[in-house]
């Protein structure tokens, strides 16, 4: 009984174990299935994740480009806005209003008068009651000039009435250097010979005179001496300041020529008379008057409007006195008194000439009590020669004196335009080489 019980218990235990084993196997199978499913799900999830990542990479590239383009647009818009703000600030806060530039002529003149500092003082003069009514207009015109001259004399401490004459030693040295340089250039390049020869060749000669040939040119070796300089008021109504300077020159300036006088009657070249002439200036002295004038002044324009009488020999006994009468002439361009512009000259050339003759100019003339000495040598004939004929000498000397009087003796004068003294770049020079003592050996133009 007991064995049956034990057997039955054992069988029950064995059956229970078998059940447990089957249950365990079932659980293991289900666990393996779950693991397989989980692994499959993980693989599927991994694939989905990879696909999702690929989709994210593809889709994220487009927003990045859009984001980059938006930043560029913002940068450009920002820069433009800054430029606009700066332009508005400069226009309205730095520059003036454009309407201010469109002012009238009167307001422009008013602004100019406010910029230029005028230091002219009112001139004290006599009342109109004490003046001649006929001279009121002239006095009104001359009063600014007289005031200016008085101011100059006052500020330079120069007394016209009591100032002693001055020597011009320094001026003599400068003039001597200039003349020496001109003589050197004339001797080296022979330009004085070529210019005189061209003038004589191109001159219109009468039919009875053959070609003129140069035989002697002597430009001298001495220099003029200027002395006894004094400043005086002009004798005319302008009252301008003039410098009176004594000039003395003792030198020999010679010009020698030879030609032939042709006798063409009754047939051409019937006879030929050789002529040799030599004219020398051996002494000149006189009082030189120098003044700076403005060619735009009314008094000078009045002188330009007066035509010069044609020079010619006068048979009247007082011809020399008539030459020295105060007849104003036009010597503004330092030409001969008979050089009157032809009627065929165009308006453009006249306007250009008038424009060139305006501005500051140097006026000079000599007093009538000058001294001019000549030495004239002549030789006429071929085989039998006449030497130093007095009549020929006096005729040539008279012509030369008349030529000089008609151009340079008061009241006539010569006018030389003064070049502009304003510093210019093209006139700038600089030393490029110097020796051990610091003396400049060579100069060249400064770079422009």
UniProtKB/Swiss-Prot annotation:
GO terms for biological process: mitochondrial genome maintenance; mitochondrion-endoplasmic reticulum membrane tethering; phospholipid transport; protein insertion into mitochondrial outer membrane. PROSITE patterns: SMP. One of its GO terms (molecular function) is lipid binding. The chain crosses the membrane at residues 75-95. InterPro entries: Mmm1, MMM1_dom, SMP_LBD. The keyword Endoplasmic reticulum applies. One of its GO terms (cellular component) is ERMES complex. It is found in: Endoplasmic reticulum membrane. Residues 313-332 have a biased composition (Low complexity). It is a single-pass type I membrane protein. Keywords: Endoplasmic reticulum, Lipid transport, Lipid-binding, Membrane, Transmembrane, Transmembrane helix, Transport. Coiled coil: none annotated. Residues 119-144, 303-357 are annotated as: Disordered. Residues 127-140, 345-356 have a biased composition (Basic and acidic residues). Pfam families: MMM1. Residues 1-74 are lumenal. Residues 164-419 form the SMP-LTD domain. Its main location: endoplasmic reticulum. Belongs to the MMM1 family. PANTHER family: SMP-LTD DOMAIN-CONTAINING PROTEIN, TEX2 PROTEIN-RELATED. Homodimer. Component of the ER-mitochondria encounter structure (ERMES) or MDM complex, composed of MMM1, MDM10, MDM12 and MDM34. A MMM1 homodimer associates with one molecule of MDM12 on each side in a pairwise head-to-tail manner, and the SMP-LTD domains of MMM1 and MDM12 generate a continuous hydrophobic tunnel for phospholipid trafficking. The SMP-LTD domain is a barrel-like domain that can bind various types of glycerophospholipids in its interior and mediate their transfer between two adjacent bilayers. Component of the ERMES/MDM complex, which serves as a molecular tether to connect the endoplasmic reticulum (ER) and mitochondria. Components of this complex are involved in the control of mitochondrial shape and protein biogenesis, and function in nonvesicular lipid trafficking between the ER and mitochondria. The MDM12-MMM1 subcomplex functions in the major beta-barrel assembly pathway that is responsible for biogenesis of all outer membrane beta-barrel proteins, and acts in a late step after the SAM complex. This is Maintenance of mitochondrial morphology protein 1. The lineage of its organism: Eukaryota, Fungi, Dikarya, Ascomycota, Saccharomycotina.
């Amino acid at each position: 009984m007991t064995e049956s019980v034990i057997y039955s218990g054992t069988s029950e235990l064995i059956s229970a174990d078998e059940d447990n084993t089957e249950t365990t196997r079932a659980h293991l199978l289900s666990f393996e299935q779950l693991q397989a499913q989980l692994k499959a799900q993980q693989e599927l999830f991994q694939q989905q994740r990879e696909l999702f990542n690929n989709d994210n990479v593809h889709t994220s590239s487009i927003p990045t480009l859009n984001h980059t383009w938006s930043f560029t647009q913002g940068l450009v818009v920002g820069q433009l806005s800054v430029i606009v703000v700066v332009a508005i600030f400069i226009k309205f806060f730095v520059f003036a209003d454009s309407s201010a530039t469109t002012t009238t002529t009167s307001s422009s003149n008013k602004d100019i008068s406010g910029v230029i500092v005028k230091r002219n003082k009112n001139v004290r003069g006599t009342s109109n009651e004490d003046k001649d009514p006929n001279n009121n207009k002239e006095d009104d015109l001359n009063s600014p000039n007289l005031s200016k001259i008085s101011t100059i004399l006052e500020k330079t401490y120069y007394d016209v009435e009591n100032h002693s004459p001055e020597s011009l030693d320094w001026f003599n040295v400068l003039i001597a250097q200039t003349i020496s340089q001109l003589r050197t250039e004339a001797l080296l390049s022979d330009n004085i010979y070529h210019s005189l020869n061209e003038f004589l060749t191109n001159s219109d000669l009468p039919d009875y005179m053959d070609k003129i040939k140069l035989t002697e040119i002597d430009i001298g070796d001495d220099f003029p001496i200027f002395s006894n300089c004094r400043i005086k008021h002009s004798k005319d109504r302008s009252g301008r300041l003039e410098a009176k300077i004594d000039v003395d020159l003792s030198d020999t300036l010679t010009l020698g020529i030879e030609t032939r006088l042709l006798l063409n009657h009754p047939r051409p070249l019937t006879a030929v008379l050789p002529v040799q002439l030599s004219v020398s200036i051996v002494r000149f002295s006189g009082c030189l008057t120098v003044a700076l004038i403005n060619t735009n002044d009314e008094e000078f324009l009045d002188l330009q409007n007066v035509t010069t009488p044609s020079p010619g020999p006068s048979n009247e006994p007082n011809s020399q006195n008539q030459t020295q009468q105060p007849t104003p002439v036009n010597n503004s361009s330092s030409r001969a008194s008979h050089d009157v512009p032809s009627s065929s000259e165009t308006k453009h050339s006249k306007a250009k000439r008038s424009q060139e003759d305006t501005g500051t100019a140097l006026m000079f003339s000599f007093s009538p009590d000058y001294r001019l000495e000549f030495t004239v040598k002549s030789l006429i004939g071929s085989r039998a020669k006449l030497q130093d004929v007095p009549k020929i000498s006096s005729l040539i000397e008279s012509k030369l004196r008349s030529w000089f009087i008609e151009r340079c003796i008061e009241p006539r004068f010569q006018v030389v335009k003064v070049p502009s003294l304003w510093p210019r770049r093209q006139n700038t020079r600089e030393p490029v080489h110097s020796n051990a003592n610091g003396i400049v050996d060579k100069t060249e133009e400064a770079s422009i």
